[in-house]
From Swiss-Prot:
Domain of life: Eukaryota
Key words, A-Z: Chloroplast, Membrane, Plastid, Thylakoid, Transmembrane, Transmembrane helix
Protein name as annotated: Protein PsbN
GO biological process: photosynthesis
Major subcellular location class: plastid
Function: May play a role in photosystem I and II biogenesis.
Gene Ontology CC annotation, any one: chloroplast thylakoid membrane
Originating gene: psbN
Cellular localisation: Plastid, Chloroplast thylakoid membrane
Any Pfam family matching the protein: PsbN
Family, per entry: Belongs to the PsbN family.
Topology class, membrane: Single-pass membrane protein
InterPro entries, A to Z: PSII_PsbN
């Protein structure tokens, strides 16, 4: 394969894996540890 193709595939895989990790952190099991500043603030 050409170098440009390998670089494009590598960047695409990196972007997809980062997006998957971000979604897992936001909505998966670690999201229970995140704090919500709107719930902490009382009016």
């Amino acid at each position: 394969m050409e170098t440009a193709t390998l670089v494009a595939i590598s960047i695409s895989c990196l972007l997809v894996s980062f997006t998957g990790y971000a979604l897992y952190t936001a909505f998966g099991q670690p999201s229970e540890q995140l704090r919500d500043p709107f719930e902490e603030h009382e009016d």
